[in-house]
Amino acid sequence: MNLGIIGTNFISDRLIEACADLSQITIYSIYSRKMTTGTEFGAKYGVTRVFDDLEAFLSDPELDAVYIASPNYCHCSQTIAALNHGKHVLVEKPAASNKTELNQMIAAAEKNHVVLMEAMRSAYIPGYQWVREQLPKLGKIRSAQFQYCQYSSRYDKFKEGVVLNAFNPELSNAAVMDIGVYALYLFLMLFGKPETVQASAVILHNGMEGAGTALLGYKDMVGTVIWSKITEGIGPSVIQGENGSIAIDHISQFPAARMILRNGEMAEYVNNGPANNMCFEAEIFADLVAKKTVDRTFDSSYILKDTILCFDVMDEVRRQTGIVFPADK
């Protein structure tokens, strides 16, 4: 599969490095708004097909699929353009600015019979499956607290009056979209749709959400999801059942997790796999594309079902906390 890259930031570096050991994927071309930027980026990986014209990039008949790691507000338009050219798409999280955009993207994927997948790396790493397998041992789940709080490297500049892209809400940026999505996504994968959502947020002087919390209500349990780009979290995410608890270190990386039961039983997961955990999502995407070539009934709504649910909740969080993007208008 010949894969083209849209976006030349660090996350594109990580994806390309993750693909290095995957025989199914060849990094084929680069798109950047500036030719010099794209050429310099491609040179690091020996990629010489570089474009600063999106139409020309997508019109290449040898291009099979596209990885999109541009700013959030670009995801929808660039994804739909790629899908309409018959290219499979792996789009960075958050896949879109809102649920409306996501639905438009899914419709384009289904119309063009191509794969659309969100690059939510933590959903595909082995640690998540380990937690899912241990859950029955906890008995009835009564409480879960997931958190992802990471002091942004760009926040000091923001406090000095320099607003970089990461703190610009005009680009569909918010703490819930940028890092809260990791914790919310995994929480919803494990526990499903909540009956109630109660959200609060810290809004910075330019309208950017710096931190937030969602209380998620269920019939038999309560959930709390916390995120922040302006503070540093030090504790694990925790699932508490009547028979015991599971603690998960760093929800987006899953380096380790521990289960302790009231009867004294203990178990531990330690990630001994690749340091770059984006290899798992890349391999699954390649497998889905290969499957699509023989199975024309592939349903993008199914592979994106957790993304759809996450956007339902994130849209409600933003509605309650007054976070509005240009894409919402």
What are these regions (language model features)?
Residues 183-255, 283-288, 292:
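Contiguous beta-strand/loop segments that form the cofactor/metal-binding neighborhood of enzyme cores
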Residues 122-195:
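Predominantly a Rossmann-like dinucleotide-binding segment in NAD(P)-dependent oxidoreductases
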Residues 51, 91-92, 116-118, 248:
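Hydrophobic residues in well-ordered beta-strands that form the structural core
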Residues 1-45, 326:
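N-terminal Rossmann-like dinucleotide-binding module
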Residues 271-283:
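Active-site loop of classical SDR/Rossmann-like NAD(P)-dependent oxidoreductases
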Residues 104-122, 142-143:
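Rossmann-fold dehydrogenase core element
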Residues 45-108:
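Beta-loop-alpha module in the N-terminal Rossmann-like domain of NAD(P)-dependent dehydrogenases
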Residues 65-67, 284-329:
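C-terminal helix-rich "cap/oligomerization" subdomain common to oxidoreductases
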